[in-house]
Amino acid sequence: MEEKIKSNLIHSKTNEDIELIKQKLKEDRELLEKERAQFEEERKIIFESLNKVVGSGSANITKNIAKALKKAEKKNGVGSNLNLANSSSGSNISVYNNNNNNNNNNNSNNIGTPFNVQHKVHVDFDYKWSGCQDLEQVFLIDCILGTGSYGTVYKAIHKDTNFVLAIKSIPIKESEEIEKEISILKKCKSQNIVSYFGSGQQGDNLWILMEYCSANSIRDMLELTEKSLTEKQISVILQQALKGLHYLHQSNIIHRDIKAANILINEDAIVKLADFGVSSQLEDSLRGEASQLVGTPLWMAPEIIKRQNYNNKCDIWSLGITAIEMAESFPPLYTMPPTRAMLMIPNKPPPTLSKPHHFSKELNDFIGQCCQKDPEKRPSAIELLTHPFLVQNISTPQEVLKPLIDECLKKSIKKKKQSPNNDQPPPPQTPNKLSPPDTPLPNVPVLGKNQGLLNKSNGMKKSHGSSLDEAESMNTFILKSTIGSSSNGSNDTGGDDFDCGTMILKDDTCINGSGNADKISTIPAFIAALNKSNGKVITQNQQQQQQQPIASSLQQSNPIASIVNENQYPNTIEKRGLSSINSNNSLLIGNSGNNKSQNFNNFNNNNNNNNNNNNNNNNNNNNNNNNNNNNEFLINQIKKELILDFNENMKQYINQQLTNLKEEMLKEISKIVIANIPQAPIKTSQSVFNQQLSAAAIIHPISSSSSSSSSFLNSSPSSSNSSATIFKKFPNPPPTPVLINKLPPSQQSTPVTTTTTTSSPSPSPSPSPSPSPSSPLPSSSTSTVNTPNKPPINYRKSKELDSTINIFNGLNNNNTNNNNNNNNSNNNNNNNNVIQSPKLNNRPLSPTTPTKQFNNRPPSPSKFNNRPPSPSKFNNRPPSPSNRPLSPKNSYNSLEKSNNGSISNNRPLSPKNSLEKSTTQNNTSSEDISTTTVTVTSEQGGTPITTPMAFLPRPKPSPPPIPMNKSSPKRAPSPSSNRRLSSSFTAQSSTASTIAALGKQSSMSPNSPLIKERVPPPLPPPRTTITSSTNSPIKPLSPLNKSPNSPYVPPRITTSNISNNSNINNNNNNNSNSSSNGSGGTPITLKRASTTISPIMISSNSPKVMGSNVNKPLALSRNSTEINLPSSSPSTPQKPNTPSSIPTTPTTPTTNGGSVSSKSSTIGRKTVLQVKSIFSPKK
């Protein structure tokens, strides 16, 4: 019974145990099903993530995983163990339990990550790792690779798989930028873009897992090799980079930070684009433009700096700058601070290679295509892939880049071995780069095995700072509308920040003064560049003491205001000035709104607040002082940099203003010069010069209204009332001038004639002296020249005065009609001019400019043969024989005609009378007068007559009219006074051309009646004897004498006539002067019916014409022919226009300009013609 009872009890216990075991098994099955379901879900997630990462190879991975799972299930043997458990005893149950535990251990050992159920390595749909909370236990941080636009990049190793990858640590505060970068990395699946493995949060930072490129960046390769790349290497790198850019641009993504530091290369020589921290995903795919100012200054496109809308063509510009960087190891403008470089990029021409001749044309063209300021002209990425510089390279990337990669790897390994902290374990630090090197990190979690990461990063920063001038701004700048990272925000400047924007740099090496690691400082980009250029922050006490006086002076005064005062910067700097510096040491640059005057007051107040807070926090006092000193030092550097920028801008502005001012001054000066250029003299004035200069005569006009009237060069005659000044021709050197004084105003209204004739050395019986220079001229002192006495002026008749006045009155009236009549155009070139031919040694000084101008003109012989014939009445007169050759000078020396009548008071005029009446009428014919007398008159109320070195004669009263001599059977002699002055009248040619025309009516003498035009009477036969009122003998001057057998002048001048006329009365020895015929036995030159006859002086170089001396005079025809004497100066012929002319005879110049002589002689080789009467008055 006891045994049964025992057996029953045992059986009942075993049943209970079985029930319990069954219950446990059921529970275990439920758990297993749940785990399987969870595992399937996780496996699907893994498969999907692997499909995204791996791509087309995900199908094979799925099959392999399925096979591995089946094998694991077979090894577990869960179903058989369960069946055995149902029919086994307690021992069997214990065996099952043991086996079950062993199976669980086998599961954990055999199924590797990420396929086990322990969730060792897992990522979700957002590529977030969910397997473990502490990524430090999964990854081993090896070294720091570099810093990006928002964080630091490390080289890491996955502990379970030894897979090498790159981890980018970014502060979680920058959530917007992180989301942008992650979203872009998720979408980018290209061979030339770094792969994205996922992300996970570690402390206050976010870790982004990316593909690792063993050869690092192109920038690292340039620094390691210390040499630039070859054109083949550049071609391969650019080709692959353009493929990556094309993929991004197709996805409507702008990288915005293309540079050598962001182009990576792996061991297989595959180029990959990295660092999408500032990349932009354009929402508007149609427009495809952005406007945010981001990027690295030296690589920024001009449209980004100008804050204009831009598209993906900005990456093409950056790629062109990168090509220059690879070819020359540095980008353009790398030696300049970033702010100055950003000012120069939009304003300077596009950058090129510094030595383009050292590189091929294809590379220069590629850079030129990329770096075009107009974005529309830049080619796209797909177009650049067809550029000859990229197409001509046939080599594979491995062949070209593999040697470079191996060299870089060797040098990097060697550099690691030589580093001092290579084998020493560094102190525990966090793998972030948020604190400066000398700042302690309180309350920071410690990575177990990842120690010394920050020290390595700091050492790397030091090496980077030493290799390049960090003012080249290799860091990426971001212009933001607001800071967003300031915790206090007490000194927010309002809405003006958005308009101007603040250029900031995400510098992970600085934290705020309170020492809290979660508050990230944002400082201006150029301050960060200056900070890097100056090395580490000043930590020594001596340097702090040196900076303290600077800091105090900056706090007491406005730094920007001092800059404005020193450089006189425009007031608009307030709109661009510094707004404030908040308590987080964030320097905001932009418009400060209404707080412009309080910009730096806020800065000083904030510094004071910081100092108060530091006094309360003893642990952080040193840190705040260091930061304050750092800021003050940086502000001082900013001041210097702003001064340099301002000076450069002011230099450019001043140079531009100077060039504009020079252009304006040149324009004004040219206008003044053009306005002051003397107008070209008209034809009448030139004829005046030609006539006077060829004859080498001296004109002595009287200035009637002004003593300082300008010379001919300064005022050319433009009206009939203007008077021209005649300059003289002198031999070299010129003699001392004879200066005659001006008349007093009381005598200016009286017309005065000054007659000067050539005389022999014998004294004249006249007691009247020559005019003496008594009153001074305005320009020079007076001086006289001793000359022989000549007949007095008192013996001269008033007809001479009247004729001279009339000649002056009619001058420019004829000048105004020069271009009216073609038949009279040649005759109009001869002005009436009364000139003197004194000795060349005593002639007054005259300017040489007109002499050179008019004496060098070639003759115009065409006027000779084209002159119109005289009236028909005189055309039938036989020509006068002449044996003298044609003189080009005399043919040139012609003055403008004065169309005045030669008959007055119903009687024929003598040579002097015809001269007196020659200018009373404009359109009547006049006589040609050639005398040795200089006659100058002044009109009443007319334009003043001025001549350089003018001689001023005495005024004479008007004499009575000359009576007619009716007793002469052959040829009526001129009146006695005219006889007396006949030889002196020979110099009286061309008076009117000497002085510009005056008023016709106002200048006429009261005693001079109007000249009536009438036909002159026929001439009687020539007279045999000539008497003169003066006893001075007449010496033969030249062999040019008239033939006694030719009493008439030929109707027109021809070459034959001139040659015949050149033989008239050579070497006349008669010593008496006759006013009736004027020959006096002297050689006579005939001039045919032109308005005026100039005195012709034969120069010393001209040959003397030989002939016979004839003692009896010739009776000349009224139509006398001009005989031209040889001269050294060119001349022009003259045309007849009047029926009468006055013959001229050569006379010699004398020194006395005021006396009258009745004889003509030859002195030396100078010969002057003397005028003779051409007809006798008819009874």
UniProtKB/Swiss-Prot annotation:
The lineage of its organism: Eukaryota, Amoebozoa, Evosea, Eumycetozoa, Dictyostelia. GO terms for cellular component: cytoplasm. Residues 762-776, 954-963 have a biased composition (Pro residues). PROSITE patterns: CRIB, PROTEIN_KINASE_ATP, PROTEIN_KINASE_DOM, PROTEIN_KINASE_ST. Residues 111-124 form the CRIB domain. Residues 12-53, 621-668 form a coiled coil. Residues 139-390 form the Protein kinase domain. One of its GO terms (biological process) is intracellular signal transduction. Residues 705-723, 743-761, 777-788, 812-833, 864-891, 964-997, 1024-1046, 1053-1077, 1137-1158 have a biased composition (Low complexity). ATP binds at residues 145-153, 168. Its cofactor is Mg(2+). It catalyses: L-seryl-[protein] + ATP = O-phospho-L-seryl-[protein] + ADP + H(+); L-threonyl-[protein] + ATP = O-phospho-L-threonyl-[protein] + ADP + H(+). Residues 834-857, 892-946, 1121-1135 have a biased composition (Polar residues). Transmembrane segments: none annotated. This is Serine/threonine-protein kinase pakG. Belongs to the protein kinase superfamily. STE Ser/Thr protein kinase family. STE20 subfamily.
